[in-house]
UniProtKB/Swiss-Prot annotation:
Chief localization: membrane
Classification via SUPFAM superfamilies: MOP-like, P-loop containing nucleoside triphosphate hydrolases
Name this polypeptide is given: Maltose/maltodextrin import ATP-binding protein MalK
Physiological role: Part of the ABC transporter complex MalEFGK involved in maltose/maltodextrin import. Responsible for energy coupling to the transport system.
Annotated ranges, domain ABC transporter: 4-234
Positions annotated to bind ATP: G36, P37, S38, G39, C40, G41, K42, S43
């Protein structure tokens, strides 16, 4: 096992900068997830750690060793890709031991490691099968096993579940989490799926256009996003945003005017906030309230109702801003499309973002953070 540090790491192809001044500390045994939209540079960052991409400037350390000029095979890292990349003519055992065989390992060592890893990944009964006889989830476990038998210090996973169907992705997510707890290895995992990030990570790194937008624990990013990008990316359905204007400030409070002219005091940091400033109020669909238990409400026309059984999602068009807000409530809510529907805004669950997108720190203490 080993820690990983990136110091001012930049990657550029000509004039195109895909990763800019990345600074990260990944602790020994930590499970870290790089998450962000397509093209944000998360896979490039992983490939630089693996040695598959050169670093334009900056320094990469694994343990105490600077790795910039160290070949991939000597870095002590193992990588699992989106594609299983299994040899179809080899058995599961032969696929898992292939790297060790190329490295000249003794047959007894190969057999011992393959059998140990097969037990961990529940593949022992499949060792003689060929890849074509395996399910997608089993093939992915073989790909993970092939990396594990090499006993890397750092385990890199580049969107390993993207080729699986929804049910298998949930199953493999659980298995990867259990595997990390059992092995205690340093793992760095790349995904565009924020559900995978929230459920797997000890620490999440949110990337936006080649820069680190925020680093933190899952619930920290959910409850206290650093900017509007993180707020909109983490959470599903995404956070609702409303244009507001600042009408007053006080110590640790900001009053804003909503599109329907109602005013609401928000418990957020007020330092640097100017009266008259245009800002954005954010609130998650699951934090909106029924109108009968809220002091501040918004009213609109129901556009779409999504009944999911365990919850209902209602898309409401607010006339003053001509955009839909999403309201999410547990259980079944019976409402017709076209009906008038009112929702409430609890001040303590609201977020406030400046014009540059940066957040005014929320002061309400959330559980688990």
């Amino acid at each position: 096992m080993a820690s990983v540090q990136l110091r001012n790491v930049t990657k550029a192809w000509g004039d195109v900068v895909v990763s800019k001044d990345i600074n990260l500390d990944i602790h020994d045994g930590e499970f870290v997830v790089f998450v962000g939209p397509s093209g944000c540079g998360k896979s490039t960052l992983l490939r630089m750690i693996a040695g598959l991409e050169t670093i334009t400037s900056g320094d990469l350390f694994i343990g105490e060793t600077r790795m910039n000029d160290i070949p991939p095979a000597e870095r002590g890292v193992g990588m699992v890709f989106q594609s299983y990349a299994l040899y179809p003519h080899l058995s599961v055992a032969e696929n898992m031991s292939f790297g060790l065989k190329l490295a000249g390992a003794k047959k007894e060592v190969m057999n011992q490691r393959v059998n140990q890893v097969a037990e961990v990944l529940q593949l022992a009964h499949l060792l003689e099968r060929k890849p074509k006889a395996l399910s997608g989830g089993q093939r992915q476990r073989v790909a993970i096993g092939r990396t594990l038998v090499a006993e890397p210090r750092v385990f890199l996973l580049d969107e390993p579940l993207s080729n699986l169907d929804a049910a298998l992705r949930v199953q493999m997510r659980i298995e990867i989490s259990r595997l990390h707890k059992r092995l205690g290895r340093t793992m760095i995992y790349v995904t565009h799926d924020q559900v995978e990030a929230m459920t797997l990570a000890d620490k999440i790194v949110v990337l936006d256009a080649g820069r680190v937008a925020q680093v933190g624990k899952p619930l920290e990013l959910y409850h206290y996003p650093a900017d509007r990008f993180v707020a909109g990316f983490i959470g599903s359905p995404k956070m609702n945003f409303l244009p507001v204007k600042v009408t007053a400030t006080a110590i640790e409070q900001v009053q804003v005017e909503l599109p329907n002219r109602q005013q609401i005091w928000l418990p957020v940091e007020s330092r640097g906030v100017q009266v008259g400033a245009n800002m954005s109020l954010g609130i998650r669909p699951e934090h909106l309230l029924p109108s009968d238990i809220a002091d501040v409400t918004l009213e609109g026309e129901v556009q779409v109702v999504e009944q999911l059984g365990h919850e209902t999602q209602i898309y409401i068009q607010i006339p003053a801003i001509r955009q839909n807000l999403v309201y999410r409530q547990n259980d079944v809510v019976l409402v017709e499309e076209g009906a008038t529907f009112a929702i409430g805004l609890p001040p303590e669950r609201c977020h406030l973002f400046r014009e540059d997108g940066s957040a005014c720190r929320r002061l309400h203490q959330e559980p688990g953070v």
